[in-house]
């Protein structure tokens, strides 16, 4: 405790006694470079103060990127820091939504400060330790054509916004990760060459890499001691000491284990099959074969099917998941033998169809089977099937409906169904080829291996292995030893190895790219929204997305894939959806996925009604009614924002000049202004879709799409809007989650509840959430270590739980 008090005292003394700012911790952006020289759209003007330079940013086409040399010098001071402040003085044009500064690497925003006049918000974007971009939004209007002194101060997980020397907001946020690559770009007054253009004047723009940097603007403000970053650093030091102690304990335990194991050593031979480890003499079933691990070798025998003598009313038939036929109940229908579960369609000349299914040895008619969807193909390309009433188009993918073929068998689409066919190098174990076994070309003499080689059977094929001291001439013959033939190379599994004099070279196979040591599958374009390129030109999409490149969000709402409760409406989100309570209802902070938790709001009891004093509020389901007591002559007036509005009165909202409200018998009805684009006096700020000017159009972030004024779209978990040539984007609104542990699935934007704390993305900074490792050492939340006795198992104290996983790059 005495050490901690001394540590804190030293920190406080250093923070309070400091006078001025050390140039080593100040990034004076307008001192390092002048945007008024060589950059169109920027001019030097008179600022709020006369002793420093101020710059006006105007125009719709400019590219103010800090030169690489100056950017590298500035960013070096910020790299790896978790305590800094962004400070400046500005005067921003009304309704402008622009970026003050942005540090980018590729598509990732490492640090960005922007001010939205359209949404009246200040937004800070930064990268976190989870390699995700976190956005913190402060409802505040800077774009009012007035001078403001702004400071955003970050101290580890503590974020504070100061405006005009007033502390406006104070938040707890994830700790920023300022791992800034050398080739990062630094933009001023814009996000990139085409978006987020700030319009107005900026002065004294600087980043102060020091505790409580806001005091350079407002020296009279109170300072806290120690800062959150000081405390965070102390916790990190304790974690390092814990790790040293754990590593020492691990080495000691390992030494003790080795000493105790010197007397006797027995290594049991095991078998590895499909990433599964089997012990000696352990047996298992693999497809249609019974296998046993014997002395480290897998020995398999084909399952022999016994002859069947099926009783009356049954017939031999395959059952899903079995190798041998079994006696199954059957039905006789139209001279056909059907087994349990099979269907038969009766197509009448009149066009009617009836579907019957064999159940309990009796054919039962299946109701509703004749309700068929419309087909998109010509009638000549429509095929009538025997097991269903609905026709299908020629080329229909039956395999996608039900693939009963095993891993060594391919599903093949036919005109009226699907069948299984063994892959090359395999032969059927069942009559229908649903299960297939590998052909041992070596044992059966069906190989082409020549002298100096040994035939080795492989799944579906064989290979010729050179004898010791020989190298490969081609696939079937050898002459002496080289790296490629012996496997003593570092070529990727999707690369070809070429022997050279004194070495070898690797070249990726067609459809893959890389240096040969590492080869990755190529997909045209790239797999979007969390999709992965599984093989050349094949993207595997995560749930909620579709398309060749996973570029299409599945709108579960419009496609009717979900059914919200009666008092909720479906809201689509990228990769997901949620059910939102309708007007007049709320979930009372008890969230349910389908909106079942939505309950009526009692506007009368909660004081949300607008009834005048001479009427009586009567609650309704999803609303309310203002009723006049019997015998009274009521005015029908409304109470809105503590003001009396007369019955039939119409007014414009003070906070939104684009919304019109009216009083109707005690109830206030508000709506957006009706846009009549034919009216020459229409307000294009309220009706941006009525702005026909080309200068009011916006370019999409990818540079390939053009939007008109008023258009909205979703990009990178943000909802964007084009307004008179300016793009403003803000984070999507996510539904609340009532749980302890959440994660954001890849490709999605909003957190979902998970029961496993190890799957959760967020790591609590609460130091009381500790863990006990395998040595009995207490670990703080967020600390990580290599598990004792392993080299590749990484453990982490996460939300009070020990979570371990194997690092595949370590194996």
Curated annotation (Swiss-Prot):
Function text: May regulate neuronal differentiation, polarization and axon guidance.
SUPFAM superfamilies: Concanavalin A-like lectins/glucanases, FnI-like domain, Growth factor receptor domain
Subunit structure, interactors included: Homotrimer.
Leader peptide range in chain numbering: 1-18
Domain annotation EGF-like: ranges: 395-437, 438-479, 480-520, 521-551, 553-592, 600-635
Gene Ontology MF: a single term: protein kinase C binding
InterPro entries: ConA-like_dom_sf (IPR013320), EGF-like_Ca-bd_dom (IPR001881), EGF-like_dom (IPR000742), EGF-type_Asp/Asn_hydroxyl_site (IPR000152), EGF_Ca-bd_CS (IPR018097), EGF_dom (IPR024731), Growth_fac_rcpt_cys_sf (IPR009030), Laminin_G (IPR001791)
GO BP annotations listed: fertilization
Lineage: Eukaryota, Metazoa, Chordata, Craniata, Vertebrata
A cellular component term, taken from the record's GO annotations: extracellular space
Domain of life: Eukaryota
CDD domains: EGF_CA, LamG
Subcellular location: Secreted
Domain VWFC: 269-328, 636-691, 696-754
Keyword terms, alphabetized: Calcium, Disulfide bond, EGF-like domain, Glycoprotein, Metal-binding, Repeat, Secreted, Signal
Glycosylation positions in this chain: 222, 290, 295, 515, 613, 633
Residues that hold Ca(2+) according to the record: 438-439, 441, 457-458, 461, 553-554, 556, 572-573, 576, 600-601, 603, 619-620, 623
Pfam families hit by this protein: EGF_3, EGF_CA, Laminin_G_2, VWC
Database matches in Gene3D superfamilies: 2.60.120.200, 6.20.200.20, Complement Module, domain 1, Laminin
Intrachain S-S bonds: 399-411, 405-420, 422-436, 442-455, 449-464, 466-478, 484-497, 491-506, 508-519, 523-533, 527-539, 541-550, 557-570, 564-579, 581-598, 604-617, 611-626, 628-634
Domain Laminin G-like span(s) in chain numbering: 54-225
The protein's name: Protein kinase C-binding protein NELL2a
